[in-house]
Structures are given as structure tokens and as C-alpha cells.
């Protein structure tokens, strides 16, 4: 009975902890764990196979080998339970205690723990304030260290060589103590008085001025504080007792043939014990010092190898020349405890097989082979057979099943009914990679999958395999049915759009049946209803594509009260669409289906169905769509042949034109009119334009055909060319691919991204010649190499993202903040890339939104969740910007609140409490990662580079508005832009912005602010190949520091006789020209300097290298004239780190190579005296204070003297560094920048991701702050702390009327942020396990198990979703608050640095 009670206690022990604390283990603690000392290196007796007494597998220490049986066999069976055999010393108990009983080794000499010594920064080194090198010299017996100077002039911790030691001994006799080896270090650590050391350091910090010293001091203070707080003692970092792992965790297994397989740990322990025993014997014999020293050093090395092999010196290898796996290796890395056994486990009740298509299945079904089902559901079948009385025992049932009797299959059917199974396809990149289905038994051996879920699984049927898992418990079945069923996952969590969308052949079928063609049989007929249409079609009276009139009955279902109203109307449609209307669910307007069913339209149809009619109807509808699509795709019989690739007749002409243009430019280049760079640029431009023209001609040829209509006129209509309908419907292929088949392949890129200027003029139908084929190989090979690299990189990015965001869970409904982000439409190059409605859909409004010019009545009030209806309302009111709540500004102390997050994208309503939004965000960003390119944006290597834009042509009629534009009026009456951030927008009649364009510096603008413009009108133009310098005043030119042949080179054009001057590169000028700075200054007629309007700065322009001046000294210039121009470099394909690496760089917050330099404050620009390699840029504040910035000469400064800049504006071109944006502009602009940059990469690949996912990750990157002024807080200046801790501490200080700490936000990359989380378990299982655990142990960190990862590792439900309720229930059941829980449990489960907790539950693999 007593044991029964014990049994339950054991079970309870594991569930009832609320935190895990890790600390240094004291020698006494290690002895208290131990069941005896291991004295001998022997393992087992090789004759009897019994463990040796006192050896590494000793039964007396670790427990019996067989259950309830002592080693010598004197006591057997349960009745002797708990007896210790007097003959062999074994306790009679269960054999599994050998998994948990530890032993110990008493070390004859102390040994430093390698983790605290070598793991940087060295903890022992910091504690003693000695360098690692010095400590190692002491430990490995190369030098003495003074442990107690006494009255001598020696210093404590001073190193002495052998000679110095002997001299000192002669000089001072025994007045001082010095020693070497770990004893010395142990002694030094033991005698440190932490309190007084702390006081001394604090005084020193106050008085010191040097940065490096301050850093070292704060590090030491933090370390000593950690020791004081955790109750660890410094001398415990040097071990005197070594714990021995329980033997069953380092097993020794006999193989056949009398050999043994053993864990490497046994070898390492054997080594330690051997050396320890030898050392003990030498000490007893009083051996000579040098021998003892050598033995001590060897002991130190063997313990080092046991704890962390290879950390110091060469790794100890076994017989097979492989390094032995030490304790540290057991827990770190992909094969370590954390990632192999705790975070990823193999599951029983699972099977895998190849998948095939199941086009007749319903969306919630999957076909499961009978063989598999029988195996998976075996226990259930056994139980049912017994209950039915078909078998008396389980054994009999087993026989029945093995014989596969007829009744077994009936029983299996019953067992399976309503019992969902989970299907999973690896790689599982997002949560839709595992979904639940109801199994349908099928013959054969392949799993059948519903075609519509292929997109979510990213599955195809070319040999993919999938795994099946059976949820066993009732709760698991419930969750599978309610949350994971494929019918519940219609919308994608990444963007809220339907993911159950027909693709490929289904789309083709639907598109084919909904196309309208001229003059088909039955055109113009009128039908009373759709069934009449069907009859006519079946009897071949009408053709599928004929245009007809049909009376359609439209039923509207009120979503609120379910009232049904129906109305009929006669609609112009086609036979196919009328047939399609039969499967539309009630309440879905027919006009949605009365179009060509391209993939986009089908997606829109399903989306509308979901929003209007809800889940159930949509699922049924999607299935019907699929069946219909397959049926009509079969009827269509679409196939492609080589004749479908029609080559346009114009191709020849267009090519001839282009070749002539190229020739002309080549001649200009040879006569010196254009530079080599310009020639290359222009040639590439001509070819990309030509390629576009041919593509357009080709699409026109393929996409239209001439037909006679019913009246006999010849008209153009969309053709039914097989290739074209595949691309047009979105079933397969794209315009870019057809272009290569039937147009011209176009420009190719080299692997480095530069474009080969000779294009491929042929297409695949004509075939490539040898040279063209060769040029193509670049792209093809690069594509393959990239794909391999990409997959690995993308997976690693996903892993980092998940790790940084894993603990972001919705924890409350509203945090009450009024902060948020201001959303405006995204406009690029004049097109609205993403309208406001798409950006704010599913967000919560942070401030009331008013109509422009009406401040009385808000259209939308604060805290409204914007759904489709609200968004439409905002659009009608032409609102241009809305402030919405964002996770970045959420003030929840742990996790985020539902209001700041907004809509749950996959469900379409406000997000539930407990949703793991962090993981969803990480998956949504990581899953499309494999679609992103590695470097370049090419289609099969074909360069996709737009021809250089050199003007603005408006696309809509409206009025012009300038934003933020500084311009001067040219004599011709046009305006010339002299600012860089200027923009031109086109507003429609309602004042709504329709287009927006950036105006480059030096652009000539032909329209005025407020002018009316017509669509197609050009409003601005500029030279795309040259960057001009524009004069802002009228006057005469004076050259300064123009020295011919030194700073400038004269060039005369043979053809025109015009002279131009090119400024040389300062690096190439001689030493005598160091001080020269070529400047163009503008003076009046008398030669006096003119000033730039509204400033007192002279009107002068510093000329950068390579700029060209076409004017002569003394020439007159007018306002807006070009003084000089700077040629632009040959442009590469838009290939500034593209794709995946760009996303990774942004999330890792890496500084770009040559970052843009931003203005540190607002003011007027001027230039000071240059230094050797730098230019001096000065920004003068309004109050007259100046800020200087030294900029390398090779960087191009894009601002001119006298220009006004605002804080955070770019002054030197480049990629801005996110840290600078945060420092100068703050958190919101940084968030906006990251979102924009990351979205640009994804948008280019056509991937849609909702902004809020990127915001969630950004929030995690901004978790930490840096203390700038500690006030009265416990933090130190320059320390990085969790923002939440500072806020809490400050709140406490304010209530006591003390000075709160001041801080700046810090941006950490995702890897750094993951390692800096509060939970050490989560950080250790991510990367750098050793470092994380070392630090945690020294600090005595306690992990409150708040995140998801920690709970998975300790084997609990995660505190998210359904697990949230479980955790709340657990707290409630104990009836305690968190803090009481902590005080009650006293010491939470303690793990010590030799990772016992991590190892105790896992078998040696």
C-alpha cells in the first residue's frame, strides 16, 4: 500500500512545478544527489556480464539490473521490496531507477569547469578580473599566482613565473602564499568578498572616464550582482566533486559476436576515474612535484573533455578517429536533446504513403487505403470485436484481423466513421501543412487527396508522399474536427484570401464554359429559366459559348434574420454561364459569375461567398465548382501543339528597326559622342523596349482572331488559342513564358546580375542558334544552383522567425492604447500598388476618422474593426489616411491584445484570446520564402528590366498637385525641380488621389500646381542617363580650382567642335592637387558672389568626380539652367540584394555596406574644409548650432550647399540603416520602413502577406531598450533590458517619488532577439546552447515557462489556444496567484550545468 501512495506522489511531482531554475551545483548538492562514489573505471565483467562493484555500472550505487532482484540472486521478487542485500549491496527495487540514480567522483584535486572558463566572456576571468590567457597559464601549470600577498609588496592575483617565484621565496620566505593549478583559482574565488568588491566597483564606476574601463566594470558588477542574487558561490565554478550520469542514460549494449556498443560518455568517465585514482596514489606517495603537476593537468584535461570535448585543445577521439560525444554535445545542435528529442518527437499511430488525386471526394474527405486504416486503427478494431462478442480475447481478435475476415472490414468502417485523421505533407511550412480529414476506405495502396487542398499542402501528384496520424483522445479528435478540418481552413492565415481555390484544369474548365464567342449556334435565343437552357444545350440546340438571354431568379438572404427575398430578371449571358448559375448558392448575386471565370474571378467568387453566406455554403459551393470544372475541362479537350505558338508578322520589322538604332548608337560611340557606359545603357534600353513591343505584338496575334458576327461584319474577338486560354485563365503559364515561346527570348543576365547586351532574338518555336543557346545557359544553371541554396536558407529564416515570435499570444481584449500607425495607400511609379482599403481591412481604428473638412461627425469611431462594409464606406468618402491600431504600439505587458491585432485573417472575425499570432506571423513570412529568388529577378534568366523612365505621363484626367516640391522657374516658363523628395499627384474631381509620382532633381515640369490635365498628357521629363546640377540664380559662371590636366580634363568633340570638361577622380590627382576643389560659382556682372535665395550662403556648386561641364568660364546662366551633369553608371538588373537575402538582412537588422547618411538634425547644408579622404558636411541649425559629418570622398553627396534638410532626410545616397531610422525618426517610421521594404520583395514575386505579420516580428525586434540614464533604478547605464521590465520598474519608482530610468529603444536582429529572451530554455534550444546555459546558471535564472517553446520542452500543453484554458485551470486549481505559487514551491525544479534535467528523460539514441 505504501508503495502505491509513493507511486502517485512520483507522478504529481512532475506536473506541479511552475518554473524551472538553473543554478551552479555546490559540492554538497552533488553529493546529496549521489547514491555512492564511483571508485573504479571498470564497467561490466566481460565473462558474467554483471556490473563490477564500485565501477561505472555498479548495481550497489545505481540500482538492480532486473526488476526486484538483487545482483547475486539472494533476494528475488516483490516480497523483498526495499531490502538492501548484505552480500552484494544492491537494493531490491525497480530496474528503472538506473535511469535516475546518480553517482559521484571525489576529485583528488579541484578542476575548473570548462564552461565557466572558456565560454566567452569567461565567467571565472571576469570574477577574478584576470585575462583568460593568465588563468589558463595558472590552471595548466605554467605560472604561479599569488593567493595571499601578506605584508610583501606582491599583489594579490599577480602571476609569477617559476624563476620569479623562487626569487620571491628566497626574498620573503613564507610571508606570502602562491600556488598553481585549479587549487589556486579555487582559493582566489573562495576568498572574494562579493559585497565589498561590489561597493569598490560602484565607487570606481563613478570616478572612471574611459569607455573601455566602464564596459569592463559594468560587466563585472552585473556578474557579482548575479552571484549575490542567485546565492551561487564563485568557488563552485571550480569543481571538487564530479556527478556521474545514471548508467541507463549512457548504456553499454552487447552486440552479437561478443563485442559491445557503448556510449562515448563511458570512455570519457573512465579516463577521468583512471587519472583521478592515479593522482590520488601519487599524492599518497608524496611523488615529485613535476609528476603530480603533470597528473593534475591531465585530470583537468580529461574533465574538460567529459564536459565539453573539443572546447579546449584537440578533441579526444575514440578508436575510430571520431571525436567523442561529450555531455555538452548531447544537448546542443540539431541532433542534441533539445531539438531531436524534446522539440521534435516521432509519433505512434502514423503511416505514410504516396498520394494520388481524388476528384470525387468531398472537401472534408480523404481516401485511406484499407491496409493502412486497419493497421492504424487496430486497437479500436480489437476493442470493437470484443464488444461485439466476435472474439473472446484480444489474442483471438488479433487472429481475426490477421486473417482479414469479412466482419473485420465492417467493424473497421464503423470505427472510422466520424473519426478524423490528420494528413501532413513535409515540409510543413505553415499550419495548413497539417489538416484533418474524414477517412474514406479505398482499395489500393495510395492515399487519395482532395484536389482543392493541394495549394495549402503545396502538393502535387508526381510522387509526393504524405503522412497520416490518428488523434486518439476525445479532446484531440474534437480539436481536429473543430479547428483543423480542411473545411475550416478556407482562408489563408497569411493574407485572409481563399486558399481553397481551384487551379489548373478546374480553372481551365470553368473558364472554357464561361467564355462568350460571336456567331455561335443559338445566339440571341431567350430562355425562361436555366433548366430550359440545360435542355437546349443537351439537345445540341445551342452551343456552350453562344450569347443568349436567360431569366434568372435571384434569391437574397438577409444575413441578420435569414429573411429570403427573391426577384427575377432577364440577363444577357452565355449558355455556359447560365449552366454555371445552377451551382451558385442562394444569396450569391449572379453578376459575380456572369464574367469570364479566370482564376482571379473564381477566387473573388469564393471570397464573396464566404463573406456573404458563411463557411458551410462556401464549402459545398467550392466542391460543386470543382466537379463542374473537371466535367467541362474534359469536354473542352484543350491541348497544345507547336502551331499554337503564333509568331507575329511584325517581329521581323521591329527587329530590323532595333538593329538600326543599335548601329546608330555604336557609330555615335565610335565618334566619341557617347561614353561607353551610356552606349551600353542605351543599347540595353533599346532591346528591352523592343522585347516589350514584340511581346505585345505576339499577345495581340495569339489573343485575338477575326470572326464574322451575326450581322456578317468582321470583328476582333478574344481567340480560343489553347496557349492563350491557359495563360489568360490563370490555369498555367504566364505572358512572360509565352513571350519566350512565340515572341523573342529577350535580354539575358550574367550570373552577377549584369545584362548581356546582345539579346536572344529567337524564340523557342524558331529555335536558338549556338551562341544564343550558350547565352541562355547562364540563367538556366544559376536557376538550378539557386533552388538548392534557397530551400535551406528559407528554412533557416523560418526557424529564426518562429523562434523570435513564438511567445506572442493574444492575452487580452484591449490594452487601451491610443497609439497606432497611420496608413496611406502605397503608390509606386504612379500606380496605386495597394489601395487604402486593402491596407486597413481587418484592422481596428485607433482614432475617430473624420471626413476631410468636417470635424463634427466622425465616419468611423475609435475601436471599430474595419470589415468589408466599413472599408467601402471609407472609400466612398475618399478618406486618404486612417490611424489604425498595430501590434507595434500595443501596450500589453505579455503578448498582444486582440484590438491591436485586429481580424484573425483565417476566420474573418476579431482574433480570439489565446491565438498564437507570433507563430502564425512567422509561418506566413517564412512559407513563401522558397518562392523568393536568391538574388536576381529573372524569368528563366531573361532579364526583366524596365526601360529607363524619362517622363511622367498621367493616366487619368484630373488636376495636378505638388507635394513637398521645391522648384525654380526656367526662362522657358517651365518649372525645374531642385529638391529630391518632391512628388506630383493627380487628383480626381472628388479630390481623391489617383496617381503619385516621384519628381527627380532637375526634372522639367510643364504643368503648374492645380492645373487640369488630361489622361496621356506628359507633365514632366528629364534625362535618365545624366544627373544634372541646376542653377537656382541667374548670373555668370566662374570656375574655381579648375586646373587643366589636374582637376579637369578638356575634351573636344570632333563632330561638333564643342569643348566639355570632365572632373577627374581625386584619387588620381597628384599630391600637389590635394587642396583643390573644383567649384562652379555664380557671380553677377561685376564679379561679386551671388547668394542662394533666402540664405546667406554663396551660390556655388561643388562638382563631384566624373561630372561634365559644357559651359565656358564666364558664360551667362539663367535660373533653372543646367550647370553640369553627372553621368549615371551602367545600371544592373534591379539587383540590389533581392529576394530572400534581402528579407533576411532586414529581419536581422544588418547595417548595409555603404549606408545612406541621414541628416542628424534639421538645418541648412554647407561644406567645410576637407580632410585627406573625407569631405566635411555641416548642417547649421535654426539656432545657429552646427553639426559636422565627415563623409568619404567616394560617396556621392546628393544635397547641395544652401539646401534645407529635415532631420532624418537622406544627404548621402545609399540604403538607409534601420538603426539610423529608429534613432532619428522613431519607432513608427522604422516599422513603416521595414514593412515597406519587406513587402516590396514579396510583392515583386506576387506573394501577398498581410502587414500585421511583419509588424508582429518587428515588435519582437524592439523588445529591448538601452538605459541612457539609470536614475534611482537598479539598472546600469548602457545595459540592455526588456522594455516591460523598465516600464514596471519606472512605475514603481514614480510611486515612491524617485527618479525613473531613461531609455532609448534598441533594434535587435531576429537571432539576437531570440537569444535575448527572458526564457533560457527557449534560447538554449535555439542556438549557442552552451553560452546561454552558462549565463543562466551563473545568474541562477528562473524560467517561468510562459512561452510556447518552453512548455513543449517540459512536456506540457502550450499556453495558447485550447492550452490557455488548461493553464488557467491549473492555476485556479492550486487556488494561488503566480507570486504565491513561487514562494510556496520554494526552489523550483533545479537543473545544474551538467544538464541533468535535460538528460534525465531521454534515451541515448
Swiss-Prot record:
Stored Gene3D superfamilies: 1.10.132.30, 1.10.150.390, 1.10.1790.20, 1.10.40.90, 2.40.40.20, 2.40.50.100, RNA polymerase II, clamp domain, RNA polymerase Rpb1, domain 3
SMART domains registered for this protein in UniProt: RPOLA_N (SM00663)
Superkingdom, natural source: Bacteria
Annotated binding of Mg(2+), by residue: 460, 462, 464
Alphabetized Pfam families for the sequence: RNA_pol_Rpb1_1 (PF04997), RNA_pol_Rpb1_2 (PF00623), RNA_pol_Rpb1_3 (PF04983), RNA_pol_Rpb1_4 (PF05000), RNA_pol_Rpb1_5 (PF04998)
Binding site for Zn(2+) 1: 70, 72, 85, 88
Cited InterPro entries: DNA-dir_RpoC_beta_prime, DNA-dir_RpoC_beta_prime_bact, RNA_pol_asu, RNA_pol_N, RNA_pol_Rpb1_1, RNA_pol_Rpb1_3, RNA_pol_Rpb1_3_sf, RNA_pol_Rpb1_4
CDD domains to which the protein is assigned, alphabetical: RNAP_beta'_C, RNAP_beta'_N
MF-aspect GO terms: DNA binding; DNA-directed RNA polymerase activity; magnesium ion binding; zinc ion binding
PANTHER family referenced in this protein's UniProt entry, alphabetically: DNA-DIRECTED RNA POLYMERASE, DNA-DIRECTED RNA POLYMERASE SUBUNIT BETA
Subunit structure: The RNAP catalytic core consists of 2 alpha, 1 beta, 1 beta' and 1 omega subunit. When a sigma factor is associated with the core the holoenzyme is formed, which can initiate transcription.
Name this polypeptide is given: DNA-directed RNA polymerase subunit beta'
Name of the gene encoding the protein in the UniProt record: rpoC
